[in-house]
Amino acid sequence: MLNAVFTFAFLLASAPPTDVTSLSWLSGRWAGSQDGTDMEEIWTDARGGTLLGMHRDVKGGKTVGFEFFRIEAVPEGLTYFASPQGRPPTPFRAVENRKDRVVFENKEHDFPTRILYWLGDGKLHARIEGTLRGQPASEEWTWSRQP
């Protein structure tokens, strides 16, 4: 009986947080520049069970890419819904959620299959990973917090 109690307590302690407020560190306006493209990512405060966000890339004064997303607490856990270029949302479930780092995964999606966010050196970093044309592929972004 005592072993069962300790096992249950351990499982609870090691389970990733399922409340969106655990991702409050994402909130704010973030901006950066990469290869001549100005990038911005904006996340709302974690309220009402969701974080809402958007990303925009501007090059030569024109928007060349955008994405809407939300992170929501659903029965299966924290889920990131990505809508690149305004397409229907694709869900990615949180497989890791710790202080200043979160990893979402959808192994059934073509690309990416993983989305990672983390804080480091006072900057927000994101990385997507997966397979393209049978080869491992990834892309990474870095933004600085804006006023």
Q: Residues of each region from the PLM?
A:
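Sec-dependent signal peptide recognition
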Residues: 1-8
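Cleaved targeting-peptide boundary
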Residues: 11-22
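Beta-rich carbohydrate-recognition and catalytic domains
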Residues: 20-25, 80, 139-147
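Central antiparallel beta-sheet cores of small beta-barrel/beta-sandwich binding domains
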Residues: 26-27, 32-108
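Edge beta-strand at a domain terminus
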Residues: 94, 99, 119-125, 129-147
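Charged, amphipathic alpha-helical segments
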Residues: 110-113
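Exposed beta-sheet edge/beta-hairpin loop segments within beta-rich domains
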Residues: 115-117
